[in-house]
Amino acid sequence: MKSRPAETAAVSKPKVSVRHLCKTYQGRNRSEITVFNEINLDVNPEEFVCIVGPSGCGKTTFIKIIDGLVPATSGSVYVNGSEVTEPDFDRAFVFQADSLYPWRTILDNVAFGLEIKGVDRKERYPRARELIKRVGLSRFESHYPHELSGGMRQRVNLARALAVDPEIILMDEPFASLDAQTREVMQQELLNVWSSSRKTVLFITHQIDEAIYLADRVIVFSARPSTIKAEIRVEIPRPRRLSVKRSPKFLEYVGAIWNLIESDIFESVSISE
């Protein structure tokens, strides 16, 4: 197991580069509140990176800045060497909350991004069907979101993100609302899709075991004002199966990351002894 200092080593051509990123906002009494400060991170092409940290440390804000949904106070984000100033089709965002359109069928939901992109109907629907098949929902393409389970809806969200063929997928706790068994099934489904698509993924989670199971690297945020406390390179061979979560090496990673964030978690929820 390798834990490295907060600032990552430079790579030749990172897919995502974050440099000196800072986010502040004005509190109720007009005081300046710093969410995070001096965040530096490189993410390589096809890499799966998970971010963990205590509640309120700015994980969601961080990936929204990478997507261009939220402006940084200072610092910069680069995708393929170009500075991010707004959302673009090279990035897709999968939200924690269900973001499917209830009046659209599953097929129409998956095809929506292609429609916005201006792809012709004759091209976008075969593409949407291909992705629906990839996530195992071919029998449900004419159904509406309310007719699907939570896990099935998140598969549709993933298919919709993949439909526009982004280079980067940003995922904000997409399995948080699912029960434990469904969450584990979705973790395996996500790895299966990622192994075939080889997209670059940044994935936010509060679940340490989920981060270790999915990631090539786990980035650990400190409590607010956040910095990158450490990065853990997960040296567990792929392909991974759920049974690996019971292995001594996996549990060693869980313990190491928990030791890094335990005090910050108690601080973030204001629990004192």
Regions from the language model: what does each represent?
Residues 75-87:
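Conserved ABC transporter NBD signature motif
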Residues 52-54:
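The feature captures the beta-strand-to-loop junction immediately N-terminal to the Walker
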Residues 104-111:
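Short coil-to-helix segment of the ABC ATPase nucleotide-binding domain corresponding to the Q-loop/switch region
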Residues 143-146, 164:
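Conserved signature/switch motifs of ABC ATPase nucleotide-binding domains
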Residues 67:
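Helix-to-loop junction immediately C-terminal to a conserved catalytic motif
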Residues 169-172:
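Catalytic Walker B motif of ABC-type/P-loop ATPase nucleotide-binding domains
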Residues 111, 115, 122-139, 192:
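Conserved ABC ATPase "signature" region
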